[in-house]
């Protein structure tokens, strides 16, 4: 089994940012190209009232993909809004002073090609958290026209 190596000279994190590096399990070149995708899900863990937590929150933001010059290695830069947007439904009539912590993510995070040969390198704000998902599709199917 081969593992990715951190050989490319990835940039250092800028002030107010952190760099997260992780490896993806090898799936085979053909499967990685045709069946797998990586979804980066940046967000923040926010403290809020129970009523606010029952509503749907999102953090505006963007994920930009960059390439290490001369290496072809990809890395990602995340920008997140400072404040979350929220629905405004009144849900609980109980004490609103009770606080809970909730992960609030960027809405509709994009999918990126799955590449296990290089590490996944992501730069994001110091107070942000990164979660990710692996999407796997089956065999391609063709729609029939009438």
UniProtKB/Swiss-Prot annotation:
What's the gene?
ISP1
Disulfide linkages recorded for this protein, renumbered to the chain, are none
Protein name, UniProt field? Ecotin-like protein 1
Its family? Belongs to the protease inhibitor I11 (ecotin) family.
Matching Pfam families, A to Z?
Ecotin (PF03974)
GO MF entries: serine-type endopeptidase inhibitor activity
